[in-house]
């Protein structure tokens, strides 16, 4: 098992990034809660990782800290929740907000996440509540996000939302509703998700 990787960010386009470690490029899938903390390309970063091996693919998931990774591991143990949905949860509302929803049994907010129906939301609460009762990260991502090196942050943001399970029309409508110029892709995604999932 690969526990963590320290290397240079070559490319980043949510939910994927390319990390070069000792001359080897690792393609890593990460939640948006991790992307909010990533530096610019060509900068060094340490990512905690989780490797999932299947017959058709070996997929490496990366996380800003061990708290995120532990929550991801708890999520994929829930019946009906796979890695893709676990990433959508971490991307949609973030670790702390998810824990708050679980501990307060806020089913209505959980079902706003793409792919999470009422039954899945109820299972998330039932199967993770005990383990999350002492959860604290004390790690709030920057509300401004990080500047994307890509010259098309709007399109990158729409693509990232689609990768999370939103329909193209929903993704475009959410991004278009943000009337703020010169924002990075990460910030656009964060604001769009805040509106769609949290309703604020």
From Swiss-Prot:
It is found in: Cytoplasm. It comes from the Bacteria. Residues 133-152 are annotated as: Disordered. Residues 144-148 are annotated as: Flexible linker. GO terms for cellular component: cytoplasm; Holliday junction helicase complex; Holliday junction resolvase complex. GO terms for molecular function: ATP binding; four-way junction DNA binding; four-way junction helicase activity. GO terms for biological process: DNA recombination; DNA repair. Residues 65-143 are annotated as: Domain II. Keywords: Cytoplasm, DNA damage, DNA recombination, DNA repair, DNA-binding. InterPro entries: DNA_helicase_Holl-junc_RuvA_I, Hlx-hairpin-Hlx_DNA-bd_motif, NA-bd_OB-fold, RuvA, RuvA_2-like, RuvA_C, RuvA_C_sf. Gene3D superfamilies: 5' to 3' exonuclease, C-terminal subdomain, DNA helicase RuvA subunit, C-terminal domain, Nucleic acid-binding proteins. Residues 149-200 are annotated as: Domain III. CDD domains: UBA_RuvA_C (cd14332). Residues 1-64 are annotated as: Domain I. The RuvA-RuvB-RuvC complex processes Holliday junction (HJ) DNA during genetic recombination and DNA repair, while the RuvA-RuvB complex plays an important role in the rescue of blocked DNA replication forks via replication fork reversal (RFR). RuvA specifically binds to HJ cruciform DNA, conferring on it an open structure. The RuvB hexamer acts as an ATP-dependent pump, pulling dsDNA into and through the RuvAB complex. HJ branch migration allows RuvC to scan DNA until it finds its consensus sequence, where it cleaves and resolves the cruciform DNA. HAMAP family: DNA_HJ_migration_RuvA (MF_00031). Has three domains with a flexible linker between the domains II and III and assumes an 'L' shape. Domain III is highly mobile and contacts RuvB. Homotetramer. Forms an RuvA(8)-RuvB(12)-Holliday junction (HJ) complex. HJ DNA is sandwiched between 2 RuvA tetramers; dsDNA enters through RuvA and exits via RuvB. An RuvB hexamer assembles on each DNA strand where it exits the tetramer. Each RuvB hexamer is contacted by two RuvA subunits (via domain III) on 2 adjacent RuvB subunits; this complex drives branch migration. In the full resolvosome a probable DNA-RuvA(4)-RuvB(12)-RuvC(2) complex forms which resolves the HJ. Belongs to the RuvA family. This is Holliday junction branch migration complex subunit RuvA.
